[in-house]
Amino acid sequence: VFFLFNVLPGDPAQMVLDQNATEVQLQKVKKKYGFDLPIGKQYLIYLNDLAPISFHSKNTNDFTFYSSHKYGGLILFSFSKVSVVFKAPFLRTSYQRQGKKVRTIIAETLPNTIILAVASIIIAVLLGFFLGIISGIYNGTWVDKTIQLISTVGMSVPSFFSAILFSWIFGALLNAHTNLNMTGSLYELDDFGEGAQLQIKNLILPAFVLGIRPLAVIVQLVRSGLIEVMSQDYIRTAKAKGLSPLSVIYKHVLKNSLNPVITAVSGWFASMLAGAVFVEY
């Protein structure tokens, strides 16, 4: 990702300033953010900034010069011209929002991302369990095959493409019926611009799109677990005792097929926090 952003066309120093910036101004910005350094050295400095134990130059003119005000942390020891520092990961300042720390920007937007991820995983779990149970019960029928087809498509389609497709269909073509927006914020100012109001409808499309892939995985896991458990001897015994199919599934099958699903859900939640950027508008 680091190298990809650096090979894209455009000058970040020019983005910080404007088209009328002088060469002297551009050079100052490049020196401030390290854009004038070789790409390989920039990457090593980037890793050094993220590392809890980092190496810093004692030369005040060097880009990696240690300043407690800038990096925080404390110096463990020094040798020659290098200081070894213990610190929290340093995310620098944003060159798009000059002077604002990246850590602060993330802290401002992270709550909404967590809300989106939680909403997505809830949708994925509820629909995934329902469709997985239906698919397992009707194993081999057209219902099972239809659910399996939808699940396979859900796992295959990238989130960014699903986001574009769903926003176009439900936010543009069917907007008169759905009343959903293509873009929007979780909190929006009221008509008087005085207070932020929660807009649940702006959460529906992103949450559903982000939940498609984990939903598809949960469907497969629940279905396979259901089929495997239902073939066990104790399930046949439960049926022989006269328990209804619903009781067998609820009391015996689901409880014994949940472990892989719970493991998958915890892993998917972590990936959702990172992947939410593809569907957040």
Regions flagged by a language model, labelled:
Residues 4, 18, 139, 163-165:
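Active-site-proximal flexible loops/turns
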Residues 36-125, 129:
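An internal, D/E-rich "acidic patch" concept
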Residues 25, 29, 39-54, 102, ...:
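Hydrophobic alpha-helical segments of integral membrane proteins
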Residues 110-115, 119-143, 159, 172-175, ...:
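Alpha-helical transmembrane segments of integral membrane proteins
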Residues 1-51, 55-69, 170, 174-197:
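Hydrophobic alpha-helical transmembrane segments of membrane transport/permease proteins
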Residues 8, 154-157, 273:
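Transmembrane helix irregularities
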Residues 20, 144-168, 206:
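Pore- or pathway-lining transmembrane helices of multi-pass membrane proteins that form conduits
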Residues 18, 31, 96, 148, ...:
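Phosphate-coordinating loops and pocket residues in cytosolic domains that bind phosphorylated ligands
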